[in-house]
């Protein structure tokens, strides 16, 4: 009875080995074939597991009028480029060096107590935290709101304070927890960043799924001011200037993947002989090319993962694919310095010469791995930036 191809074999079909070049797409000379529906599903499931995702995210489609770039995705795309530059040896960015995961949250509900109400005036924002993953430690959290220049009053000092709404009450003021205070001029323009990291312990310990933030504005002489008159924009602002929250996480441990069934290994039976091979027949010493004629020595080869070909560009923002690479080649004695061989690999190769049926050759394997970053939408339309460690082969060697 014919066996159905396993997921690892199908994964190999999704990853295209290249002859050379480092473009965003593999060259047309790369061997490819169209996968069947069942193969495609198995392959997608396997790669999702590698990416640490339980399933394929399915973000809600945006109406045509709302498809102009929004503030959170634009900011997260800048973070993605900064994280990519950091992985390539660029200057480290604030919070990014310690973060494995960055999540943005869009303001879901907004309430105001402004003109016509009793003072103090305030603006309140609410965020849905149901998508925060378990087992992640918060390293930093920020609230970002855009400020336009204000002439009411002209060129005066403003104090912007942020509080967490701990508990709401129907007959009295809500219980608040102070988070941050920023001082600026009324004529300033740009993104105002408020540190809300202190609120993260409450989310994680109490498993709160709704975060309320309240913002107050005061003048230098202590008078309460309508945040809108101070130039602070809310949900009615253009999409590229709407407020949002960003949280940086670091995984407490590597995600555990579900084990796959594996066939038991068959032990090779050694040949019964008391004679050593003839000296001129020792594999690897006198042959050109270190081993089987025509075989290349251990080195790195290119391997490309295409999210476009997987049909995932409806939720993957960047990249469209990436070069993962793989290691392949001979590790036959003598092992040159270019093979990055370990002392154990050299010893194993020597013993293999004497007893090739008992001790195998050293293996060509990665000696250095690096991370790759993926920016995508989750099923709640939050934008996620996740750094996946040990996903790209940087160097190969004999082990």
Curated annotation (Swiss-Prot):
Residues 20-260 form a propeptide. Disruption phenotype: Deletion mutant mice show normal embryonic and postnatal development. Homozygous mutant females have normal fertility. Males do not show germ cell defects during the initiation of spermatogenesis. However, germ cell degeneration is observed in about half of adult males. Homodimer; disulfide-linked. Growth factor of the TGF-beta superfamily that plays important role in various biological processes, including spermatogenesis, osteogenesis, steroidogenesis as well as regulation of energy balance. Initiates the canonical BMP signaling cascade by associating with type I receptor BMPR1A and type II receptor BMPR2. Once all three components are bound together in a complex at the cell surface, BMPR2 phosphorylates and activates BMPR1A. In turn, BMPR1A propagates signal by phosphorylating SMAD1/5/8 that travel to the nucleus and act as activators and repressors of transcription of target genes. Belongs to the TGF-beta family. This is Bone morphogenetic protein 8A. It comes from Mus musculus. One of its GO terms (biological process) is osteoblast differentiation. Keywords: Chondrogenesis, Cytokine, Developmental protein, Differentiation, Disulfide bond, Glycoprotein, Growth factor, Osteogenesis, Secreted, Signal.
């Amino acid at each position: 009875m014919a066996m159905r191809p396993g997921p690892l074999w199908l994964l190999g079909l999704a990853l295209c080995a290249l002859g050379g070049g480092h473009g965003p797409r593999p060259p047309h000379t790369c061997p490819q074939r169209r996968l069947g529906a069942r193969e495609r599903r198995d392959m997608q499931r396997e790669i999702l597991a590698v990416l640490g995702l339980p399933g394929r995210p399915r973000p809600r489609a945006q109406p045509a009028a709302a498809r102009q770039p929004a503030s959170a995705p634009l900011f997260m795309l800048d973070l993605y480029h900064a994280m990519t530059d950091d992985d390539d040896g660029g200057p480290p960015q604030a919070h990014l060096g310690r973060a494995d995961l960055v999540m943005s949250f869009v303001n879901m509900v907004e309430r105001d107590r402004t003109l016509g109400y009793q003072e103090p005036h305030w603006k309140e924002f609410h965020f849905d935290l149901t998508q925060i993953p378990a087992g992640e430690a918060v390293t930093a959290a920020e609230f970002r709101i855009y400020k336009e220049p204000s002439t009411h009053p002209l060129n005066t000092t403003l104090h912007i304070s942020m509080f967490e709404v701990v508990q709401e009450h129907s007959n009295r003021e809500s219980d608040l927890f102070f988070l941050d205070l920023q001082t600026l001029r009324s004529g300033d323009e740009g993104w105002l960043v408020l540190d809300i990291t202190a609120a993260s312990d409450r989310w994680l310990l109490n498993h709160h799924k709704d975060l309320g933030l309240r913002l107050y504005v005061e003048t230098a002489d202590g008078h309460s001011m309508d945040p809108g008159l101070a130039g602070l924009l809310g949900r009615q602002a253009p999409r590229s200037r709407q407020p949002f929250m960003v949280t940086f996480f670091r995984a407490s441990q590597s995600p555990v993947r579900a084990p796959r069934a594996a066939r038991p290994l068959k032990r090779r039976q050694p040949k019964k002989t008391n004679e050593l091979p003839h000296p001129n027949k020792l594999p690897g010493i006198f042959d050109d090319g270190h081993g089987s004629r025509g075989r290349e020595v251990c080195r790195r080869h290119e391997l490309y993962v295409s999210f476009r070909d997987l049909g995932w560009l409806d939720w993957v923002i960047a990249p469209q694919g990436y070069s993962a690479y793989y290691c392949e080649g001979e590790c036959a004695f003598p092992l040159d310095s270019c093979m990055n061989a370990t002392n154990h690999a050299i010893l194993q190769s020597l013993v293999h010469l004497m007893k090739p049926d008992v001790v195998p050759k050293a293996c060509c394997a990665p000696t250095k791995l690096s991370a790759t970053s993926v920016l995508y939408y989750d099923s709640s339309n939050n934008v996620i930036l996740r750094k996946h460690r040990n996903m790209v082969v940087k160097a190969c060697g004999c082990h």
